[in-house]
Regions:
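Short glycine/serine/threonine-enriched helix-capping/active-site loop
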Residues: 37-38, 74
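Active-site neighborhoods of divalent-metal-dependent phosphate/nucleic-acid chemistry enzymes
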Residues: 57, 69-114, 120-125
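Short, well-structured N-terminal submotif of metal-dependent ribonuclease cores
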Residues: 1-37, 50-62, 104, 113, ...
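Phosphate/NTP-binding elements of NTP-utilizing enzymes
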Residues: 45
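A generic structural signal for short
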Residues: 12-13, 48-49, 85-86, 100
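Helical cap/lid subdomains and adjacent loops of hydrolase enzymes that gate the active-site channel
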Residues: 28-29, 64-67, 81-82
Length: 125
């Protein structure tokens, strides 16, 4: 399985994995699966840090990489897919992540119920 972490899932994975449903946690830990984190998520979390809404270690990307989580860049194709999505979701970060899931055929590890409205596979966390 190719798993794509939503921003909150990545944060919980690093801070408090027990917040993640055991089935999702096992899937993320399974070495047979490939797990991805978007540069969009790092940007989203970084903005929350800059606004004082979140504390995030400066080595966040490095720690994710140490856990075997691969970075997924945000491309022009992803951007075009995001602006072409039906308007179920208004959050631009979530729309970008959903577009990446669609374009890359990834399973989205999220607690966001709106994500299921799109043509993606969701792994509930």
């Amino acid at each position: 399985m190719r798993i794509f972490l939503d921003s909150h899932t990545a944060l919980w994975w690093m801070d408090d994995p027990e917040k993640i449903h055991p089935k999702a946690r096992d899937a993320i830990r399974n070495p047979k699966n490939t797990v991805f984190l978007s540069a969009v998520s790092t940007w989203e979390l970084g903005l929350k840090v800059s606004k004082g809404k979140l504390l995030l270690p400066s080595d966040f990307p490095q720690r994710m990489a140490e856990d075997g989580i691969e970075e997924l860049p945000f491309t022009n194709a992803h951007a075009i897919a995001a602006i072409s999505l039906p308007p179920f979701h208004g959050d631009p970060f979530d729309r970008a992540l959903i577009a990446q899931c669609m374009e890359e055929s990834l399973t989205f590890a999220t607690r966001d119920g709106i994500a299921a409205e799109y043509r993606i596979t969701v792994l509930p966390v």
